[in-house]
Amino acid sequence: MAAAEHADKTPKLLTKEEVMRPLAPHSPEQVRAEATRAADAETRLKVFGSEKQLPENQPPRHLAIQINQALHDLFAKYPESLLFGEDVAAKGGVYTVTKGLHKAFKSSRVFNTLLDETTILGLAQGFANMGMLPLPEIQYLAYFHNACDQIRGEACSLQFFSNDQYRNPMVMRVAGLGYQRGFGGHFHNDNSVTALRDIPGLIVGCPSRGDDAAMMLRTLAAMARVDGRVCAFLEPIALYMTKDLYEPGDALWSTPYPAPDQALEFGAERVYHGDATDLLIVTFGNGVPFALRTAK
């Protein structure tokens, strides 16, 4: 009876916000402050080589280059960050997006793994529990399905089941979306974004151009650091090397690198042709340049 009386008097969860709090903590002001906090200037110079070589002092670049630059910046900012996956070290990944990171930060922070996504995401959880900031890479979105439960059943549920006593923050990079015409049925081209979207507590970011990618990465890393969130950064393979938008050589899909104190607000949108009144198109990833070309 004493136990029953004690249970009866224990405070109850009465609102959906109270139930959701440990599953999806959100501290917008703290996240904004962390996302816009630049790495130490001296450290950045050491990483990039000189003032002239800082990415914000370079010409406009395409998506793959700016993700690479943003990763270098994150590693300069967070000494506890780690990047690992299949062929990400010396080779720089299938699309060379991680090229140079191994040389700059050595094998203790950038290293290859077995060709096993379950192992990659299991390592990420272990490192996160140790206080590190892991950025595991899943080589293709199709490969994520082999290890989906590591995120759905483990990483994203830890805060909820422990009432926020334990956290495993991470930013999982995943290359995906369609990228080869006439090759849509191939295993590498599996485009099941639903596998990410339907995971409770998971934050999914998907850029379409370089500057947005850099600022989005900063915000995702900040959400992981501040609120312990598990984040997925979905990188459109078809746009990695895309420089032009309407015509060959127009360079309209190459963008300047955003200053290190700039970041995207969680849930913020980029609006194109804001004065148009005939039609509204809401899209992401590959759909953005397609929609812009269609509108023209």
What feature does the model see in each segment?
Residues 1, 56, 60, 280-283:
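Generic alpha-helical structural element
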Residues 1-20:
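Active-site or pore-adjacent capping/gating segments
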Residues 18-23, 294-296:
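Composition- and surface-driven signal marking solvent-exposed, interaction-prone regions
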Residues 22-241:
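Thiamine diphosphate
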Residues 66-74, 215-230, 239-296:
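Glycine-/acidic-rich phosphate or pyrophosphate-binding loops and their flanking alpha/beta elements
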